[in-house]
């Protein structure tokens, strides 16, 4: 069950002509079926308990009794999830706009990777993202299971009597979500004087919406447990030090290691300076979830795209020459293209050992 839940984040991938992140489920349901399911009335019952939260950020512990009489919006996420990151501009804006009307927004941080269980990592990430609403740390998935949830991100809409009225899985449907908040506030008699216009803002970095029409590369895990399309000759040498090579040619969405790595369950760990990862991708944005293998270690790296520095195509975590430094365990935005999008070859070289690479995501 745990492995299935860990894999569920991959259900949220973008497809052309959809206004939301479509759900790519193991049952291979059609995109049309998933779209209809993404936002629908819920008969899920009463608000589940937060009593088994590991810790709380930005608030003392909250209970269902504390929230009675309030309209509550609960969002599940984990801080390296690109789909969750892209919802944040809306969620932050709703938390601010409707707070005085009685809306309580609660984030539930249910980790995917082991390093996301570290409360200090989560606290730092929430601060960097400007998140001031309450966050329940759900390291044991007690809240996740209480809601019967399976997705990052997921929204649950709770009325003032403590009943779950709606849910929405994935990105998109933001205006519909905001309208549902307003309807629940109106039912509680708390909607007076609210501006009729939906929230508006300009999102930046990994929080900016994906270019769905050009997104043809899926989230790809680097650890051996869920790795796909790995193309280094000989395949993965599981849990042992091994010298890998990049083949002369990669097909779209294939990736490979070069240098001495240990492929562990969640991540590939670099054992010697000069290790590389290559990925043939098709997307406007490329991100890599990675971090130093030891605290307070900084690992410099250099990025190339089709063999050259990215220049104006660099992401927010590198300069135009492709230079950057891994200093903490998080998602790094490495490529943000501004021109036409085509199949490109990404390569990252680490100038020192001691980095862990977990997953590629795209936008």
Predicted regions and their residues:
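A short beta-strand-turn-helix
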Residues: 51-72
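Aromatic-flanked redox-active Cys/Sec active sites in thiol-based oxidoreductases
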Residues: 75-81, 110
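Structural microenvironment flanking redox-active thiols in thiol-disulfide oxidoreductases
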Residues: 85-129, 139-143, 299-301
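Short, glycine-anchored, charge-dense loop/turn motifs used at functional sites
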Residues: 156-166
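Non-catalytic, surface beta->alpha helical segment in thiol-disulfide oxidoreductase systems
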Residues: 164-185
